[in-house]
UniProtKB/Swiss-Prot annotation:
A cellular-component GO term for this protein: cytosol
Name of the featured protein: Keratin-associated protein 5-3
Sequence repeats: 35-38, 41-44, 47-50, 91-94, 150-153, 160-163, 170-173, 189-192, 199-202, 218-221, 228-231
Tissue: Restricted to hair root, not detected in any other tissues.
Subunit-structure text: Interacts with hair keratins.
Length: 238
């Protein structure tokens, strides 16, 4: 069809020219400033998906104003702040973990399958649709927690999203249950030195150890006990 006011002629596959598409409803975009590009006008516009722009045809894996293979073109972002969401029902990517959004705090969108990056859920996948953080411990703190930063102070709830617990049993990979020996998987998983004689650091030494201690970083300020936590750093001389 003809495209008046544009450079060149438009073929039969042209959706329209420039801003003179007409008939575009809410949530639909036009051709922008370009003319005579294939199937350009009156298509759903995807908002606020990263790594896309509509500055030129094909930059989003398709024509301007069309959701391409990269997730779509940036359109009117609305309240999403240039990241995700804000498109309403015409978005090309899921923006919420639940169909009604609600607890996700984002814009309504298509729920799709669980897991993947949807509206802030992260890449490790949610254990339930209402989850907004990367993962949650279902119960307790140990191996059921995907990563150390996904737990609340008290990990009894099914929805937990904060760092290590304040209790002796914390959400990091491991903790010493009692003593310091092999019950502690690694030094990085323990709380700072306990106030008790048995602490969670790799080792502690009693007074008089001095230079005979393997590593100064493994010792507590001198304590009254003669035994120190693993690994044994020194033969204490009293």
């Amino acid at each position: 069809m003809g495209c008046s006011g544009c450079s060149g002629g438009c073929g039969s596959s042209c959706g329209g020219c420039g801003s003179s598409c007409g008939g575009c409803g809410s949530g639909y975009g036009g051709c922008g400033s370009g003319c005579c590009v294939p199937v350009c006008c009156c298509k759903p516009v995807c908002c606020c998906v990263p790594a896309c722009s509509c500055s030129s045809c094909g930059s989003c894996g398709g024509s301007k104003g069309v959701c391409g293979s990269c997730g779509g073109c940036k359109g009117g972002c609305g309240s999403c702040g240039g990241s995700k969401g804000g498109c309403g029902s015409s978005c090309c990517v899921p923006v919420c973990c639940s169909s009604s959004c609600g607890s996700c705090g984002g814009s309504k969108g298509v729920c799709g399958f669980r897991g993947g990056s949807k509206g802030g859920c992260g890449s490790c996948g949610c254990s339930q649709c209402s989850c907004y953080k990367p993962c949650c411990c279902s119960s307790g703190c140990g191996s059921s927690c995907c990563q150390s930063s996904c737990c609340k102070p008290s990990c009894s709830q099914s929805s937990c999203c904060k760092p290590c617990c304040s209790q002796s049993s914390c959400c990091k990979p491991c903790c010493c249950s009692s003593g310091c020996g092999s019950s502690c998987c690694q030094s990085s998983c323990c709380k700072p030195c306990c106030s008790q004689s048995s602490c969670c650091k790799p080792c502690c030494c009693s007074s008089g150890c001095g230079s005979s201690c393997c590593q100064s970083s493994c010792c507590k300020p001198c304590s009254s006990q003669s035994s120190c936590c693993v690994p044994i750093c020194c033969q204490c001389k009293i």
